[in-house]
UniProtKB/Swiss-Prot annotation:
One of its GO terms (biological process) is D-amino acid catabolic process. Homodimer. GO terms for molecular function: D-tyrosyl-tRNA(Tyr) deacylase activity; Gly-tRNA(Ala) deacylase activity; Ser(Gly)-tRNA(Ala) hydrolase activity; tRNA binding. It catalyses: glycyl-tRNA(Ala) + H2O = tRNA(Ala) + glycine + H(+); a D-aminoacyl-tRNA + H2O = a tRNA + a D-alpha-amino acid + H(+). Its main location: cytoplasm. Its EC number is 3.1.1.96. It comes from Salmonella paratyphi A (strain AKU_12601). It comes from the Bacteria. CDD domains: Dtyr_deacylase (cd00563). One of its GO terms (cellular component) is cytoplasm. This is D-aminoacyl-tRNA deacylase. It is found in: Cytoplasm. Signal peptide: none annotated. It is an enzyme of class 3 (hydrolase).
Length: 145
């Protein structure tokens, strides 16, 4: 399971001209689900995403996680993160989880975030989405479990 996390001043996701999720300061989480992923990996990745200390403390040092910083989370499914780009000029998506399994784990991940009392917004699984982001920093990290 892969999360590309970006520290955001604000972010939103729109599906068919409807804003489905919007946050102020916090994290935009692009989430990719791989074939071998399960709930245990989702739990571990959620723990890492929410605990990752990439927000500045009073001394300007990256020392706070999203909850300590008072931020929110916007989770957007992105199967392309599971692509194999090693060869050729076209990515292979054979490493990605089957759609039903990927959706179940995506929804599980989102629910785990919400259980941590963090405002968690979402896109719409498997939809064609427009994602807007003001990346603060820019600060972007690739987390994989």
């Amino acid at each position: 399971m892969i999360a590309l996390i970006q520290r955001a001043t604000r972010a939103s996701v729109t599906v068919e001209d409807e804003v489905t999720g919007e946050i102020g300061p916090g994290l935009l989480v692009l989430l990719g689900v791989e074939k071998e992923d399960d709930e245990q990996k989702a739990n571990r990745l959620c723990e890492r995403v929410l605990g990752y200390r990439i927000f500045s403390d009073a001394d300007g040092k990256m020392n706070l996680n999203v909850q300590q910083a008072g931020g929110s989370v916007l989770v957007v499914s992105q199967f392309t993160l599971a692509a194999d780009t090693e060869r050729g000029m076209r990515p292979s998506f054979s490493g990605g989880a089957a759609p039903d399994r990927a959706q179940a784990l995506y929804e599980y991940f989102v629910e785990r975030c919400r259980q941590q009392a963090i405002n968690t917004q979402t896109g719409r699984f498997a939809a064609d989405m427009q994602v807007e982001l003001v990346n603060d920093g820019p600060v972007t990290f690739w987390l994989q479990v």
